[in-house]
Regions:
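Conserved catalytic/switch belt of AAA+ P-loop NTPases
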Residues: 148-151, 174-188
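Residues immediately C-terminal
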Residues: 167-168, 182, 198
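Conserved amphipathic alpha-helical interaction elements at protein-protein interfaces in regulatory
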Residues: 70, 152, 181-182, 376
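Structural recognition of the conserved hydrophobic beta-strand(s) that form the central parallel beta-sheet
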Residues: 159-163, 176, 187-194
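Charged, glycine-rich active-site and insertion segments that engage polyanionic ligands
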Residues: 1-67, 75, 185-187, 194-376
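Clamp-loader machinery-focused feature within the broader ASCE/P-loop NTPase space
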Residues: 2-171
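Generic beta-structure capping elements
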Residues: 101-104, 192, 215
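Short secondary-structure boundary/capping segments
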Residues: 88-90, 181, 201
Length: 376
């Protein structure tokens, strides 16, 4: 297995996030930061890794954290050694110089962007309490609990990682401001956010953002092609197909790989055929429901439907579809759903998500969605 494939999905051991190979588009930034440390220039007190999922920002932060704490980093600028006492503490999730909020983001429990993207495309797993929005919330008491570690900790470097920083309550953000305004020697804060626009301006103005978001198209294409082994569903993949994946993933290479590996991605044309059959009355909603229950979980079918709905809306607005490989424009040439029906079906998808969190049976949810799809 090559390094790229390992980065995309083979990080099964919880400790591998700290020691995974550096992603190609992160090498320049890594060299800049490590060189700064090795030349006795301290890093900024607070750093923000921000951007959409699938860019590898969490993988970068955890790798940098491991390297900063590694006892051998002075002689190994390429990454943490993985064998010293500090690295062993990281592997066990018991490093005395590292604090993580929320606790479910600790790598012993949660994975990097790479694994988050893969998990979203793996066979459906029901959401657990540990990954719910409430579990990701950072409260004021959580920030206050960090104060002894920050202000009264022992000698040496101490690191705090605040993942999903946009989930901080206003009170928590205000409590964090004091720490940002009064930096302590040898204390480093790393904030990670998928939606930095939701961070308070006062927080963003006091942190330095890492340059993680710029990925050259050629680099992304090369990475995704190699990561997929030049195939999708065992079929040779063209450059055009890779470019479409990257476009659908908004330029995020890891998200593009996860998209290609998602069970529903290869069933987009089948969804279109089912919709046309339902709309024309050639197939009943019950029969369609029974069929699709054997193909995808309801969660995967919703993801598929959301993707298809986006392109249907684009075509109805006179825009080009993003999926050029399934003849969607041709299918809509003779019929286009009106805006109200599109809105109703979109609402049904969201309502089904909520219902599933309340333990509604998948069969019931599938039956209802097929009835709605027939009316689209």
């Amino acid at each position: 297995m090559n390094d790229l494939t390992a980065n995309v999905g083979a990080q099964e051991r919880s400790d591998s996030i700290y020691f995974a190979p550096l992603l190609p588009w992160q090498q320049t930034l890594w060299s800049q930061l490590t060189q700064r440390v090795l030349t006795q220039q301290s890093l900024p007190h607070a750093l923000l890794a921000a951007g959409m999922q699938g860019m590898g920002k969490r993988a970068f932060v955890w790798r940098l954290v491991a390297w900063l704490l590694c006892r051998e980093h002075d002689t190994n600028p390429l990454g943490p050694c993985g064998t010293c006492e500090s690295c062993q503490w990281l592997k066990s999730g018991t490093h005395p110089s590292l604090q993580v909020l929320p606790i479910v983001s600790m790598p012993i429990n949660a994975d990097s962007d790479t694994l988050q993207d893969k998990s979203s495309s793996a066979k459906d797993k029901k959401a657990t309490k540990s990954t719910s929005n409430s579990a990701l919330k950072i409260k004021v008491d959580d920030i206050r609990a960090l104060q002894p570690f920050i202000y009264q900790g022992g000698q040496g470097m101490r690191i705090c990682v605040l993942d999903h920083a946009e989930q901080m309550t206003v009170a928590a953000a205000n409590a964090l401001l004091k720490t940002l305004e009064e930096p302590q020697a040898q204390v480093h804060l790393f904030l990670i956010s998928d939606t930095p626009a939701q961070l308070l301006p006062t927080i963003k103005s006091r942190v330095q953002q890492l340059a993680l978001q710029t990925i050259e198209p050629a680099v992304a294409i090369d990475y995704v092609t190699k990561a997929l082994g030049h195939t999708i569903n065992r079929e040779a993949v063209s450059k055009m197909a890779i470019e479409q994946l990257i476009q659908l993933a908004n330029g995020a290479p890891l998200a593009a790989v996860a998209l290609a590996q998602a069970p529903w991605y290869s069933k987009r044309a089948l969804w279109l055929t089912t919709w046309q059959a339902l709309r024309s009355g050639k197939r009943s909603s019950v029969a369609a429901s029974d069929y699709w229950q054997k193909q995808l979980s309801i969660k995967e079918f919703i993801q598929l439907s959301e993707r298809m709905l986006l392109d249907i809306k684009r075509i109805c607005l006179g825009l080009n579809e993003l999926q050029t490989d399934i003849n969607l424009s041709e299918a809509l040439a003779s019929y286009q759903p009106d805006a109200l029906n599109l809105e109703v079906f979109g609402d049904s998808l969201q309502q089904t998500k909520v219902a599933l969190q309340q333990n509604v049976q998948e069969k019931f949810a599938y039956d209802k969605l097929m009835q709605e799809l027939a009316c689209l």
